[in-house]
């Protein structure tokens, strides 16, 4: 058996919509004893040790040094200015009575201005979006957001999980083939660099693991894989 990791983990979420708000509500509800983490491998899954007949099946969270759910700290970005309570209420995924119990906690989670390009999500409009000189500037703004969050929250490390809308399908282009080309593309505002790639670049540049929760191209390009290798950062 092993002791739980006692550090605080920041969960950075680009795209604070139905998926993200439901995830956050679920974690907080579990932490307050209002629900159970059904479906969570780390929290409810077990691992078999030795032979089947030995009946040694500890929970994964007791065997691997995972961060306790109470030590998860959330922040994120979106293209509309709402707090997580308002987003969850509008999404109509969870029951209102549960949301009312969680309301004080959810309202504290403010949403940061998002990186937005209508070319990649044509049916959406944003009123809470970043502006900058170029896409490199937008990436630097995301990194500044993360640094500010680190200071205010006291987290020890972070992960980033893309929960935004699925972007339009695209094939890799020359700008995606190397890190040098990609960074030049950021400076020149190249149209083939999607918002999800800007977030991923910012995360990987800071050594923050990036998980893609949508079938976007994002980190499935040589440029960002090169950056991940350079900073020794996972891209699961």
Which ranges hold each PLM region?
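Metallocofactor- and cofactor-centric catalytic cores in central/energy metabolism, strongly enriched
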Residues: 1-214, 218-230
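A glycine-rich helix N-cap at a beta->alpha junction
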Residues: 232-236
């Amino acid at each position: 058996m092993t002791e739980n990791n006692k550090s605080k983990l920041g969960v950075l979420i680009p795209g604070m919509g139905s998926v993200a708000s439901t995830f956050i509500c679920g974690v907080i509800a579990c932490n307050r004893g209002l629900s159970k983490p059904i479906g969570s491998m780390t929290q409810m899954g077990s691992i078999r040790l030795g032979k089947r007949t030995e009946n040694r099946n500890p929970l994964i969270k007791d065997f691997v040094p995972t961060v306790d759910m109470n030590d998860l700290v959330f922040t994120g970005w979106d293209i509309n200015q709402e707090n997580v309570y308002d987003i969850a209420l509008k999404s109509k995924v969870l029951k209102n009575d549960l949301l009312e119990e969680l309301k004080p906690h959810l309202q504290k989670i403010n949403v940061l201005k998002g990186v937005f390009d209508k070319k990649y999500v044509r049916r959406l409009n944003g009123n809470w979006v970043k502006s900058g000189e170029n896409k490199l500037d937008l990436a630097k703004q995301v990194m500044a957001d993360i640094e500010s969050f680190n200071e205010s929250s006291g987290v020890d490390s972070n992960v980033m999980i893309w929960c935004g809308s699925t972007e339009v399908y695209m094939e890799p282009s020359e700008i995606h083939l190397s890190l040098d080309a990609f960074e030049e593309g950021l400076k020149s505002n190249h149209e083939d660099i999607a918002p999800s790639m800007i977030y991923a670049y910012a995360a990987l540049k800071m050594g923050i693991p990036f998980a893609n929760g949508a079938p976007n191209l994002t980190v499935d390009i040589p440029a960002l894989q090169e950056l991940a290798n350079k900073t020794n950062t996972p891209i699961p």
